């Protein structure tokens, strides 16, 4: 039996309400050494997409050939992208306090949480 917690944060949200499904791309797997390169999200309500969000994030470093091959994101795509604080500020405005859902949420939430801490933004989401 898997007894891990499925919902983190406030427990009074239902899946009939609006929630945000999101995904990130990064320069690697280690939250303490790597950086976010893209954030994508949609708002779902009653199973329908209501809003969309996408931004690249400038990691201020070159990508490895492995990451380029895995994500399809190139250095050229990131050179004029927003810096982390601006990208996260825009993402948090888009989320607007709604619950978050992600495949492998611990990974994605970990990077968003670390990024917010690094740039001084509050981030205490409800997520599944």
At which residue positions do the language-model features occur?
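Conserved non-catalytic scaffold segment of RNase H-like nuclease domains
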Residues: 1-127
